[in-house]
Amino acid sequence: MDVNEFDFDLPEELIAQTPLKTRTNSRLLVVDKKTKAISDRMFPDLIEALSPGDCLVLNDTKVMPARLLGEKVETKAVIELLLLKQLEGDCWETLVKPAKRVKIGTEVSFGDGKLTAICTAVQPQGGRIFEFRYSGVFYELLEELGTMPLPPYIKERLEDADRYQTVYAKQIGSAAAPTAGLHFSEQLLLEIEAKGVKIVYITLHVGLGTFRPVSASSVEDHQMHAEYYQVTEEAAHTLASARENGGNIIAVGTTSARTLETIYSDHGAFVAASGWTSIFIYPGYKYQAIDGLLTNFHLPKSTLVMLVSALIGKEALMDAYAHAIKERYRFFSFGDAMFIRP
């Protein structure tokens, strides 16, 4: 399958650079999975599309302030580290700027020595493994010394870092936000629960690979990045109960969808599980775990566009995106939302 089949022209001014003042003021494009009918709504109208007994699945990961600015201990040259993935102990996979200045044994200091890191390995694709040394709690130092990494297409400074977190963010470990969840307020979640919809929290720590363009010309040749996920016994029980009683499983975001599909693919049922997933969903894939999907509008030729296409069909997806562009919906992380209704 040619990657170019998932390309489309997006006016640059439709790429949202800042979040709306009120989370729930986003627009919502509703697409019926069966009929492909499209309707323009506002985000709080999501409640009307949900039924008692449905299960709304949210990713409670929390974005790390993963960008660190430090200096080489030996030369005082400025070095930027971007934490990608925690390995064993205090070792992290990172991206470094400028990479050419960092070799095995290079020591970098942050915050006048509050945090130091030594390069222990150079990866084939250019990344670096660093082992961190510190006193105290690592994530507290990260909160103090780090800054929030924003997607490369966002050029404006984020005034309030909390706006790149969901209101229910809890499990720290992501390099990027699960952006479909940014539209929810605490009040809206209470109203959804009051309707009889079950809310389930699962965890998938989002890696920066989510922004990596597909470099292969054929979809099937793309190598998907791996991300850590966890689903608890309580979450699995609620999901299984909803399915057994005829409720729809609605994934909030592609991260929730990938987590649930991983578990169903591996176990054939909703069970408690944790591990690393590199599941790649594109047209031809048969969804087993989810019935509906709430998601943002994604980049052309991205794996996320492919994932959504697998749920409603490529033609229906492209029709919906053409409508969204015509109606001036806001795209990408701080943009509007799309609900694929079961």
Curated annotation (Swiss-Prot):
<keyword id="KW-0671">Queuosine biosynthesis</keyword>
<comment type="subunit">
    <text>Monomer.</text>
</comment>
<dbReference type="InterPro" id="IPR036100">
    <property type="entry name" value="QueA_sf"/>
</dbReference>
<dbReference type="Pfam" id="PF02547">
    <property type="entry name" value="Queuosine_synth"/>
</dbReference>
<protein>
    <recommendedName>
        <fullName>S-adenosylmethionine:tRNA ribosyltransferase-isomerase</fullName>
        <ecNumber>2.4.99.17</ecNumber>
    </recommendedName>
</protein>
<dbReference type="GO" id="GO:0008616">
    <property type="term" value="P:queuosine biosynthetic process"/>
</dbReference>
<dbReference type="GO" id="GO:0051075">
    <property type="term" value="F:S-adenosylmethionine:tRNA ribosyltransferase-isomerase activity"/>
</dbReference>
<keyword id="KW-0808">Transferase</keyword>
<dbReference type="GO" id="GO:0005737">
    <property type="term" value="C:cytoplasm"/>
</dbReference>
<dbReference type="InterPro" id="IPR003699">
    <property type="entry name" value="QueA"/>
</dbReference>
<dbReference type="InterPro" id="IPR042119">
    <property type="entry name" value="QueA_dom2"/>
</dbReference>
<comment type="similarity">
    <text>Belongs to the QueA family.</text>
</comment>
<comment type="function">
    <text>Transfers and isomerizes the ribose moiety from AdoMet to the 7-aminomethyl group of 7-deazaguanine (preQ1-tRNA) to give epoxyqueuosine (oQ-tRNA).</text>
</comment>
<keyword id="KW-0963">Cytoplasm</keyword>
<keyword id="KW-0949">S-adenosyl-L-methionine</keyword>
<dbReference type="GO" id="GO:0002099">
    <property type="term" value="P:tRNA wobble guanine modification"/>
</dbReference>
<dbReference type="InterPro" id="IPR042118">
    <property type="entry name" value="QueA_dom1"/>
</dbReference>
<comment type="pathway">
    <text>tRNA modification; tRNA-queuosine biosynthesis.</text>
</comment>
